[in-house]
Amino acid sequence: MAEAATGFLEQLKSCIVWSWTYLWTVWFFIVLFLVYILRVPLKINDNLSTVSMFLNTLTPKFYVALTGTSSLISGLILIFEWWYFRKYGTSFIEQVSVSHLRPLLGGVDNNSSNNSNSSNGDSDSNRQSVSECKVWRNPLNLFRGAEYNRYTWVTGREPLTYYDMNLSAQDHQTFFTCDSDHLRPADAIMQKAWRERNPQARISAAHEALEINEIRSRVEVPLIASSTIWEIKLLPKCATAYILLAEEEATTIAEAEKLFKQALKAGDGCYRRSQQLQHHGSQYEAQHRRDTNVLVYIKRRLAMCARRLGRTREAVKMMRDLMKEFPLLSMFNIHENLLEALLELQAYADVQAVLAKYDDISLPKSATICYTAALLKARAVSDKFSPEAASRRGLSTAEMNAVEAIHRAVEFNPHVPKYLLEMKSLILPPEHILKRGDSEAIAYAFFHLAHWKRVEGALNLLHCTWEGTFRMIPYPLEKGHLFYPYPICTETADRELLPSFHEVSVYPKKELPFFILFTAGLCSFTAMLALLTHQFPELMGVFAKAMIDIFCSAEFRDWNCKSIFMRVEDELEIPPAPQSQHFQN
């Protein structure tokens, strides 16, 4: 019974909804019928004659004033639309039409099944947009004290934004702290230091953490003088304090390397002890996870120091050993550091081997992966590539593979070619990047531009082919070719990550909506007509009469019909009628 009652209510509801959909037509005819019946009591004929008499007595100045007022209102609407579009990137009228008027006009289906499907689709798209707009730590980030601060001293500009540094502070708290830090005074101080906004306060806290360890060791060594050496080593120095000093206080890469080596000694000891105790409880397991992150970070930064100081082969060996020792820690993206170092050594076979492992469909892509693969493909044909020869004979198989690799890379990140071709100036890369965004393009080109220049003809091939990508994806925000549609959120996130003095690259270029252009043209044309009519009323009257005569003439109608038929023939490509045999000779 309950199911029958529910079905009857649903049918009744659908009937009511259907009747309300078409009820306005009934109301319209009822109103017309009432007006016709009440035309005599309401004196509709007299009122219409009065209105026509009033309109006949109006002077041209009234129409000029009316036209000017409408032009003024249209101009105000245009200015508001332009401001709203510049600020929010969309048309206000289009947004109101889609968001509010379309549901009222029946553009949204109220069916429950459709709602459930749309909600599932929205959740999938939201999940995809969140993953695409995730901010990643730059695997090739520079050193604050030795590189970023030196840039500030020379130019007076801040290369890092507050948002970028705040993300780094969150990363440091995630990697270098754990719940048991309050049990050790030095770690408790460093836990507060990572939250400090003032760089000098962070550096002072790091020195304080090291001094506390020194004081404790001096006090406790006499108490355990008769014990073994292993017991004396139970008071290690604070590795995270050395990390902070190497990152922010050291003014050269050599000084940073010395501090990282001291951090390595302290971090390695902590890692070995926590490795033995990790199975004793969740607290020890969290501490071991923290010590692992600290050790991996130190070794990676030591390899980057060696790369900066010209010891590239040593850096490659350290990175390979680190990837073998900790294969599951992919959050640091050490393979991108390895690819850059191998390209510096021109070890292209080793680069191809690394790409074969990480350029997989199941793994997340990056500009380094895609553009390095394109560089290797271009290297095989770039020295002999010529646009003129390719246009005459066509592309060979190797050239086609290189062009497809470039198109794939450009589709993933369309901002990179402008930096590689030096069409746009480079800045120091941020500490965090947004994949497929301008920040990732800067980070890639900053380190890989020299590798592209080293391969003869690679930049020429890129210059000749990269713009062809956009013909394959005419609507990149809606549908991609080899990747997901280009995320809309990149511009907003890049403006937060990149400094204000850098002009953020926007893709695709925002074009003014047709409504704004149409309103601007109509407003300008109407205002011009109103001004000319006010200044030269007789001349404009003659001109208007002449235009009306032209449009109403028979010759114009015949010409318009002929032009329409010619366009139809061009569209349909109708072949001409064959000539008679008598006229072929």
From Swiss-Prot:
Ubiquitously expressed, with highest levels in heart, liver and pancreas. The modification Phosphoserine is found at residue 386. One of its GO terms (biological process) is regulation of cell differentiation. It is a multi-pass membrane protein. The chain crosses the membrane at residues 15-35, 62-82, 512-532. May act as a tumor suppressor. PANTHER family: SUPPRESSION OF TUMORIGENICITY 7 (PTHR12745), SUPPRESSOR OF TUMORIGENICITY 7 PROTEIN (PTHR12745:SF10). This is Suppressor of tumorigenicity 7 protein. It comes from Homo sapiens.
